[in-house]
């Protein structure tokens, strides 16, 4: 009689086939070890996915709170200027997209780093005597977020570290840690309009530091560094031989009483990868077109970093071709009045919000100079029923239906961030509700009754 004997190795969870013994017509044979996959399904998420962590999502998604149903929700939390419809892009920008689409020229693949003609336009737009640019110095990306990702990936290896601001945009940590790159936090100083604590910054640098991330103008702070402060940052980077990743997506989005200086315009010796895009200045974040500007006047990056960026860009075959086709018209034909009107609105809202919140006992807003944000300190000793900024903002939602992001999302507890792109009437209403909320929960600190009686 024919027979089959299968020998297996059994442990607590999995079994695998070792040998197959076959008897056919009285003749024995061993078919040998069965190699290949294990006998049981074992599909697990990658290490990269397990290391990927978004602080904003982790905090916001765990807020188990419903807004007051008797009030209309006012969201001051979303950094998307298109949400309320009050800040449309310029008609010239929209027409440029229509023309590119109607032309039928941009339906295929482009080079992974972008069309040469589109890169020439970006280089021409940002070229200046202090920081000259050519098309070879431009990499087009799928939004500024991908630009930042490519820069981190080309500059840092797993086990190295990067320096990022606190408070700062959470994406830096999310991207770095997913790649096995350590994050070190340097402090911004609210009492100095969020300037960098340069001494503390320099103390963090070691032999494994791959780059310094500088975000100017700042999300979440709305701060804009002075020329003098930028020069001091460059001096630290030059002393320590650390390249800079400059996140300048809010470049030129500064208020009339302030001046924006691109970091590369001030740098002779420090190599800089500057990240920008259409999202914020042109108010089209969903169009997903960003860029990397390579500034390397001393040829410190050499060909290796440039070639590395090209190779990394080939992973997704480049950004949207239709937007690239519209880029020349967008950069050349958007009227100055559009930029002026946008900034005038943002400054008006910033002044309104700052003035209203500064008058509320227990709050300490920091006046912004640009971008789309304002940070507000909470004097927690006057709100003892709340343990931290997360609880404060949760109750603000529950009672007043006003949604602000707790600054724990940006590694800076006991502050919250306000987005200033909402319509003016909505901003006024939000500030009024925040005032009512604070008045209901404010308590005099011990020994300060005189202040409360004022």
From Swiss-Prot:
<dbReference type="GO" id="GO:0046689">
    <property type="term" value="P:response to mercury ion"/>
</dbReference>
<dbReference type="InterPro" id="IPR011715">
    <property type="entry name" value="Tyr_aminoTrfase_ubiquitination"/>
</dbReference>
<dbReference type="Pfam" id="PF07706">
    <property type="entry name" value="TAT_ubiq"/>
</dbReference>
<feature type="modified residue" description="N-acetylmethionine">
    <location>
        <position position="1"/>
    </location>
</feature>
<feature type="modified residue" description="N6-(pyridoxal phosphate)lysine">
    <location>
        <position position="280"/>
    </location>
</feature>
<dbReference type="GO" id="GO:0030170">
    <property type="term" value="F:pyridoxal phosphate binding"/>
</dbReference>
<keyword id="KW-0597">Phosphoprotein</keyword>
<keyword id="KW-0663">Pyridoxal phosphate</keyword>
<dbReference type="InterPro" id="IPR004838">
    <property type="entry name" value="NHTrfase_class1_PyrdxlP-BS"/>
</dbReference>
<keyword id="KW-0032">Aminotransferase</keyword>
<dbReference type="InterPro" id="IPR015424">
    <property type="entry name" value="PyrdxlP-dep_Trfase"/>
</dbReference>
<dbReference type="GO" id="GO:0051384">
    <property type="term" value="P:response to glucocorticoid"/>
</dbReference>
<dbReference type="GO" id="GO:0042802">
    <property type="term" value="F:identical protein binding"/>
</dbReference>
<keyword id="KW-0585">Phenylalanine catabolism</keyword>
<dbReference type="InterPro" id="IPR015422">
    <property type="entry name" value="PyrdxlP-dep_Trfase_small"/>
</dbReference>
<keyword id="KW-0808">Transferase</keyword>
<dbReference type="InterPro" id="IPR005957">
    <property type="entry name" value="Tyrosine_aminoTrfase"/>
</dbReference>
<dbReference type="InterPro" id="IPR004839">
    <property type="entry name" value="Aminotransferase_I/II_large"/>
</dbReference>
<comment type="subunit">
    <text>Homodimer.</text>
</comment>
<dbReference type="GO" id="GO:0006103">
    <property type="term" value="P:2-oxoglutarate metabolic process"/>
</dbReference>
<comment type="similarity">
    <text>Belongs to the class-I pyridoxal-phosphate-dependent aminotransferase family.</text>
</comment>
<dbReference type="GO" id="GO:0004838">
    <property type="term" value="F:L-tyrosine-2-oxoglutarate transaminase activity"/>
</dbReference>
<dbReference type="InterPro" id="IPR005958">
    <property type="entry name" value="TyrNic_aminoTrfase"/>
</dbReference>
<dbReference type="GO" id="GO:0006979">
    <property type="term" value="P:response to oxidative stress"/>
</dbReference>
<comment type="pathway">
    <text>Amino-acid degradation; L-phenylalanine degradation; acetoacetate and fumarate from L-phenylalanine: step 2/6.</text>
</comment>
<comment type="function">
    <text>Transaminase involved in tyrosine breakdown. Converts tyrosine to p-hydroxyphenylpyruvate. Can catalyze the reverse reaction, using glutamic acid, with 2-oxoglutarate as cosubstrate (in vitro). Has much lower affinity and transaminase activity towards phenylalanine.</text>
</comment>
<dbReference type="GO" id="GO:0006559">
    <property type="term" value="P:L-phenylalanine catabolic process"/>
</dbReference>
<dbReference type="GO" id="GO:0006520">
    <property type="term" value="P:amino acid metabolic process"/>
</dbReference>
<dbReference type="GO" id="GO:0071548">
    <property type="term" value="P:response to dexamethasone"/>
</dbReference>
<dbReference type="InterPro" id="IPR015421">
    <property type="entry name" value="PyrdxlP-dep_Trfase_major"/>
</dbReference>
<keyword id="KW-0007">Acetylation</keyword>
<dbReference type="GO" id="GO:0016597">
    <property type="term" value="F:amino acid binding"/>
</dbReference>
<dbReference type="GO" id="GO:0006536">
    <property type="term" value="P:glutamate metabolic process"/>
</dbReference>
<dbReference type="GO" id="GO:0009058">
    <property type="term" value="P:biosynthetic process"/>
</dbReference>
<dbReference type="GO" id="GO:0006572">
    <property type="term" value="P:tyrosine catabolic process"/>
</dbReference>
<dbReference type="Pfam" id="PF00155">
    <property type="entry name" value="Aminotran_1_2"/>
</dbReference>
<keyword id="KW-0828">Tyrosine catabolism</keyword>
<protein>
    <recommendedName>
        <fullName>Tyrosine aminotransferase</fullName>
        <ecNumber>2.6.1.5</ecNumber>
    </recommendedName>
</protein>
<feature type="modified residue" description="Phosphoserine">
    <location>
        <position position="448"/>
    </location>
</feature>
